Amino acid sequence: PNIESRFFSSLAKNLEQRCRAEGYALFITNSDGLPENDLDLLALLVTRGVDGIFLVVADELADDSVLVDELSHLPVPYVMIDRVVDNLSCDKVLFDHEQGGYMATKYLLEKGHERIACMVNAAKSMTGRKRLAGYERALTEAGVAFDPSLVVETDYYISDAYEASANVLDTDATAVFASSDNIALGLLKRLYQ
């Protein structure tokens, strides 16, 4: 992932504090969300003799066979966080992204909105696709037809979301489900101008 993400920087901060409290130093590497960097960084950490690894892989690597092979032979314990390989037997910390998208959309529906735009990174992100699925499930459950013209594709960076949010303003949406904090910040920046 990219350490500039509010989610991942907060995760890193909390992991570092907990490790320090337990007498460990946390070394952080940043793949910039590029799958090719994850495997190199994993090898670097093992070479440096770390005691264990908290691993958050790039979205595109979650089902990568090379990654599965590398992790199957990793000589140190590891915990996968957020983005995991389903068929890999290891400790995992998961977030239910589909349920999160569902709950956010259901909240907006309960407030009386039916034309709800969804700003999401579904094209490049498994996490985004799961959040979009939750959005669609909430609409279907409420009897509201899914309208693909209300789905606005964006990356997880504030600047990208700011640019993409112009497309939201071109719709008749009365509410927006922004599928990440950075996407919400980009949207808010647009709305405040």
Task: For the regions a language model picked out, list residue spans one by one.
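N-terminal winged-helix
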Residues: 1-17
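Short beta-strand-loop elements within alpha/beta enzyme cores
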Residues: 51-57
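Bacterial carbohydrate/catabolite-sensing allosteric modules
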Residues: 14-25, 43-49, 62-193
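Short beta-strand->loop structural element characteristic of the AMP-binding/adenylate-forming
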Residues: 26-30
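Conserved ATP-dependent adenylate/AMP-binding module captured primarily in the ANL superfamily
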Residues: 36-40
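Short beta->alpha connector loops
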Residues: 32-35, 58-62, 182
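Short beta-strand segments enriched in small/hydrophobic residues
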Residues: 1-3, 54, 115-121
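Beta-hairpin (beta-strand-turn-beta-strand) motif
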Residues: 1, 31, 58, 83-84
